[in-house]
Amino acid sequence: QHLADYDEVEDDRAKLHLDAR
């Protein structure tokens, strides 16, 4: 479960990075 949460956070960060572009 913890790994899943971490994956979700990473996904959000990636999304933010793409949006920031």
Curated annotation (Swiss-Prot):
Main subcellular location: secreted
Pyrrolidone carboxylic acid: residues bearing it:
Q1
Task: Give one GO biological process term.
Answer: blood coagulation
Q: Which GO terms describe its cellular component?
A: extracellular region
PTM info: Conversion of fibrinogen to fibrin is triggered by thrombin, which cleaves fibrinopeptides A and B from alpha and beta chains, and thus exposes the N-terminal polymerization sites responsible for the formation of the soft clot.
Q: Where does this protein reside within or beyond the cell?
A: Secreted
The leader peptide range reads none
**Which keywords fit this entry according to its UniProt record?**
Adaptive immunity, Blood coagulation, Coiled coil, Disulfide bond, Hemostasis, Immunity, Innate immunity, Pyrrolidone carboxylic acid, Secreted, Sulfation
Q: Which residues carry this modification: Sulfotyrosine?
A: Y6
Q: Could you tell me what this protein does?
A: Cleaved by the protease thrombin to yield monomers which, together with fibrinogen alpha (FGA) and fibrinogen gamma (FGG), polymerize to form an insoluble fibrin matrix. Fibrin has a major function in hemostasis as one of the primary components of blood clots. In addition, functions during the early stages of wound repair to stabilize the lesion and guide cell migration during re-epithelialization. Was originally thought to be essential for platelet aggregation, based on in vitro studies using anticoagulated blood.
**Subunit text:** Heterohexamer; disulfide linked. Contains 2 sets of 3 non-identical chains (alpha, beta and gamma). The 2 heterotrimers are in head to head conformation with the N-termini in a small central domain.
Q: What is known of its domains?
A: A long coiled coil structure formed by 3 polypeptide chains connects the central nodule to the C-terminal domains (distal nodules). The long C-terminal ends of the alpha chains fold back, contributing a fourth strand to the coiled coil structure.
What this protein is called in its record is: Fibrinogen beta chain
- Organism encoding this protein: Rangifer tarandus (Reindeer)
Starting at the broadest rank, the lineage of the source organism is: Eukaryota, Metazoa, Chordata, Craniata, Vertebrata
> Gene for this protein?
FGB
